[in-house]
């Protein structure tokens, strides 16, 4: 009986072809920029990422991906960052942004050997956390963005036109600061309702104990929703 010879067909998958970073583009960081998120005007933001170890080494490439470029890596002005060896930073200026929109983004940095890291901006004021955000109830905070499909781990955010807050008392001053009796208060664990309204209902209790000042703990993002915020992030 006969046996047919094997035949092979070469297929190229262009849709899922691996991204190849371009050659490093060098340029000085624009004047007056600081590390992190720099708001330039109502439609422009400059991102600056420090990357230099104790030996002066740095990664071979750095890109940014986010809502502003549909989480797409590319070797153009929408994704590839410039390198400035004098400052030890990568940077990119993003234009054509919506001042009232909150954007999620990450840095994509790595080496020619294949090491890749997805980073949130260390100076962001708000993060998206795929592991812990689901445990934050709407009654606690209902303005979180939906975690992006293109994100990996912690994702940073920015908004050009930040929401303003109108203070009810603009002339408040602490009388006799040397006489303060400060109570460190964590809203979640202080009352059964775990919110500021519950704490306000207990002000008379604190006053009876001689407390005349409250320090809310904490007021910033911290690691782990069940923590009190003392552990470092």
Regions found by a protein language model. Give the residues of each.
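Non-catalytic, glycine-rich low-complexity segments
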Residues: 2-58, 142-148, 172
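Aromatic-rich carbohydrate-binding modules that target alpha-glucans
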Residues: 47-102, 110-134
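A conserved hydrophobic secondary-structure block that centers on an alpha-helix together
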Residues: 186-214
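Aromatic-rich, solvent-exposed beta-strand/loop patch
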Residues: 166-186
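Aromatic-lined carbohydrate-binding/catalytic grooves of carbohydrate-active enzymes
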Residues: 206-233
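Core domains of carbohydrate- and sulfate-ester-processing enzymes
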Residues: 105, 109, 114-169
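Exposed beta-strand face motif in extracellular beta-rich ectodomains
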Residues: 1, 101-105
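Extracellular/periplasmic catalytic domains that process cell-envelope and extracellular macromolecules
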Residues: 55-57, 98-99, 174-181, 207-209
């Amino acid at each position: 009986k006969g046996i047919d010879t094997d035949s092979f067909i070469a297929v190229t998958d262009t849709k899922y072809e691996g991204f190849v970073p371009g050659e490093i583009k060098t340029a000085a960081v624009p004047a007056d920029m600081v590390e992190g998120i720099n708001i330039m005007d109502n439609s422009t933001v400059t991102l600056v990422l420090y990357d230099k170890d104790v030996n002066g080494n740095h990664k071979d490439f750095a890109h940014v991906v986010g809502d502003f470029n549909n989480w797409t890596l590319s070797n153009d002005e929408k994704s590839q960052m410039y390198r400035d060896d004098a400052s030890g930073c990568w940077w990119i200026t993003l234009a054509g942004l919506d001042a009232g929109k909150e954007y999620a983004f990450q840095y994509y940095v790595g080496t020619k050997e294949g090491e890749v890291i997805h980073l949130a901006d260390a100076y962001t004021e708000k993060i998206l956390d795929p592991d812990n955000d689901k445990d934050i109830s709407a009654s606690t905070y209902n303005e979180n963005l939906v975690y992006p499909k293109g994100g990996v781990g912690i994702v940073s955010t920015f908004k050009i036109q930040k929401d303003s807050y109108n203070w009810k008392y603009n002339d408040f001053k602490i009388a006799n600061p040397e006489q303060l009796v400060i109570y460190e208060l964590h809203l979640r664990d202080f009352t059964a309702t775990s919110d500021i309204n519950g704490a306000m209902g207990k002000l008379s209790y604190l006053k009876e104990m001689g407390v005349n000042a409250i320090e809310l703990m904490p007021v910033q993002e911290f690691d782990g929703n069940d923590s009190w915020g003392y552990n470092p992030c």
